A protein has these predicted regions:
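Active-site helical microenvironments for divalent-metal-assisted chemistry
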Residues: 1-176
Length: 176
């Protein structure tokens, strides 16, 4: 894929997110720009620019296809669009087989976890960052016996969380 795809995606994203602001009150387009700068390759950059377009704007996948976005990019975008009826960590696990979706979601989670971007950090922000840390652990790889290591926690594929002491296991449902 050449640079035309990522440039097209950037143009679509800038137009689609015009007037939107993030939690810190800054132009929302700065978020996809940061995510795009954090991934390698034109296809990944195109996905990064567009990763929130279908969820957060009136544009549809059909609109993107009509504007020239490739099937490869649209496939990754469909995976990245979270169906709220699917538990969050199950949705995150579904991204792992697609390298574009996985790379963009990791960059997205890392940027969204950066609480230093916010003027004031609330308890809700801290809970969201903890949720994202678990998602990053899922995407970064699976350890032995179904465990995924991440930031002092061990997240099991079956949806349980434990620190290094098995008696402290808790349901991940409280983090969804």
């Amino acid at each position: 894929m050449d640079h035309i795809q990522s440039e097209l995606a950037q143009s679509i994203a800038v137009s689609a997110h015009k007037g939107q602001v993030d939690k810190a009150g800054k132009p929302y387009i700065m978020h996809p720009a940061h995510v795009a700068a954090s991934v390698q390759g034109d296809a990944a950059k195109a996905v990064a620019w567009l990763h929130d377009v279908v969820e957060d704007t009136p544009l549809t996948f059909a609109d993107l296809r009509e504007r020239g976005v490739t099937p490869e990019v649209i496939e990754a975008l469909k995976l990245l669009t979270h169906d709220e009826s699917v538990p969050y960590l199950e949705y995150v696990r579904s991204l792992k087989p697609n390298p574009l979706a996985r790379a963009v979601k990791l960059a997205d989670l890392r940027h969204n976890s950066d609480l230093s971007r916010l003027p004031r950090i609330t308890e809700k922000d801290q809970r969201r960052a903890e949720k994202y840390a678990k998602a990053i652990a899922v995407l970064e790889g699976e350890g032995p016996e179904g465990w995924i290591d991440g930031r002092g926690l061990k997240v099991r594929i079956d949806g349980r969380v434990s620190d290094t002491s098995p008696h402290n296991a808790i349901s991940i449902g409280q983090f969804r």
